[in-house]
């Protein structure tokens, strides 16, 4: 069984965790048998999250079909809100992850040091899955050493694949139109890349 750990494709998506856009999707209706995640993306932190929105998010995440929090995280590319707001929103989602005992799917752009600092300070017990990872092996090792899992999608640094232990490596389609099977079976394996060197 292969699980697509993070996709934005509309349900139904068998063997996939569908990320719903919590802030914009006010008419959410679950598809039977579908797995979901929900959270507040750092790009949606340009304003304060209302108490009603936090309540609604927690109610969704308490449902059994919601198997993960996120995608949430920190984006220092300039697309997210002010850093203090991103941190406040992400910390609240970390609290939900811990209290509900569900993993958190993390959006991390130019923020590896920030994430590692949060892990060191907060000592979370639930898995952190860094989604859509495209960086070099050194950045992967930094996050792996902090205890994170790494999820690769359609675009990734092939050298990074060597740095990720199999038991910490996940796959995702994210916004790709390709299926998870197509992504996995058309990407070069570490063994194939070693032969080509």
Model-predicted regions and their roles:
Residues 46-56:
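Glycine-rich anion/phosphate-binding loops
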Residues 10, 58-145:
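Divalent metal-binding pocket/active-site signature
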Residues 1-45, 67-68:
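Divalent metal-dependent hydrolysis catalytic cores, especially in the metallo-beta-lactamase
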Residues 185-192:
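Conserved small/polar residues in nucleotide/adenosyl-binding loops
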Residues 42-47, 75-81, 179-181:
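A short acidic, helix-capping loop that chelates divalent metal ions and anchors anionic groups
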Residues 8, 23, 39-43, 73, ...:
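Active-site beta-loop-alpha junctions enriched in small/polar residues
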Residues 167-182:
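Short acidic/histidine-rich active-site segments
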Residues 2, 35-37, 67-68, 103-105, ...:
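Structural preference for beta-strand elements that scaffold enzyme active sites
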């Amino acid at each position: 069984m292969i699980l697509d750990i993070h996709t934005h494709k509309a349900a139904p998506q068998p063997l996939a965790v569908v990320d719903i856009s919590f802030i914009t999707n006010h008419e959410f209706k679950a598809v039977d048998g579908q797995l979901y995640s929900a959270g507040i993306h750092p790009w949606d932190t340009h304003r304060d999250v209302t108490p009603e929105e936090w309540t609604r998010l927690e109610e969704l995440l308490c449902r059994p079909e919601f198997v993960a929090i996120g995608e949430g995280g920190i984006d220092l590319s300039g697309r997210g809100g002010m850093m203090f707001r991103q941190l406040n929103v992400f910390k609240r989602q970390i609290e939900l992850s811990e209290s509900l005992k569900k993993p958190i799917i993390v959006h991390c752009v130019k923020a590896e040091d920030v994430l590692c600092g949060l892990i060191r300070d907060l000592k979370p017990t639930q898995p952190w899955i860094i989604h859509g990872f495209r960086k070099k092996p050194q950045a992967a090792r930094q996050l792996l050493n902090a205890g994170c899992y790494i999820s690769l999608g359609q675009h990734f640094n092939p050298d990074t694949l060597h740095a990720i232990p199999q038991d910490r490596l996940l796959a995702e389609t994210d916004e790709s139109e390709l299926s998870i099977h197509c992504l996995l079976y058309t990407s070069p394996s570490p063994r194939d890349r070693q032969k080509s060197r």
